[in-house]
């Protein structure tokens, strides 16, 4: 099916702040469907832009399709840090989580200074946020004894400092939670065939699912960022394949944006 051209997409919600960019994070478990979902969103409207997760950086592969990516010193030095983390989590979890968050901040800040500056009603969708970096993935690795106490303390201190420097620019206006069962995510991991992920056990996905549910569904997960407790959340059930349900999903997103 041919992809329709982007069209002008005035926001249904008038904003007294003019062209302030609305920032929405797309959250969910590994292989819940985030990449597919953001690819749908970026085709909808010329005032909508997405910042994909910088997996290419983590795998040391330069992606020519991603305007937010460029070859970095860490990439030039070699090393697939995503694969290294999955193969030896006790050795590489701290390194990976620190680099994952750094590369995410860099990509998201670059997007804020990109073409949306001239958009009439700009919306920027992040594929995950600095908050899920810390409170879902890094904390799970610490609780699984893949980070020791010293590493976890340093990571939290570093994360707090980075957010003090840049966090105000990345504060979210809303979150879209793509909710899928761990079993469905495991099946999708096999189907998409990313080499680094093929050894992920169901238990790992179950732990991540529990954390996502605590944070985004039950809202019982505590963070150091009080404003997150009040950030609006749209939960979408994505257990079924949604490639043929674009229109329904887009309407739900538009309705959600109209409330922000």
Swiss-Prot record:
Its main location: nucleus. Substrate binds at residues 53, 86, 97, 128, 133, 197. Phosphorylated and activated in vitro upon phosphorylation at Ser-74 by CSNK1D/CK1. ATP binds at residues 28-36, 188-192, 240-242. The active site is at 127 (proton acceptor). Keywords: ATP-binding, Kinase, Nucleotide-binding, Nucleus, Phosphoprotein, Transferase. The keyword Iron-sulfur does not apply. It comes from the Eukaryota. The modification Phosphoserine is found at residues 11, 15, 74. It catalyses: 2'-deoxycytidine + a ribonucleoside 5'-triphosphate = dCMP + a ribonucleoside 5'-diphosphate + H(+); 2'-deoxyadenosine + ATP = dAMP + ADP + H(+); 2'-deoxyguanosine + ATP = dGMP + ADP + H(+). One of its GO terms (molecular function) is cytidine kinase activity. The modification Phosphothreonine is found at residue 72. Coiled coil: none annotated. Pfam families: dNK (PF01712). One of its GO terms (biological process) is pyrimidine nucleotide metabolic process. It is found in: Nucleus. Its EC number is 2.7.1.74, 2.7.1.76, 2.7.1.113. InterPro entries: DCK/DGK, Deoxyribonucleoside_kinase, DNK_dom, P-loop_NTPase. GO terms for cellular component: cytoplasm; mitochondrion; nucleoplasm. Belongs to the DCK/DGK family. Phosphorylates the deoxyribonucleosides deoxycytidine, deoxyguanosine and deoxyadenosine. Homodimer. This is Deoxycytidine kinase. It comes from Bos taurus (Bovine).
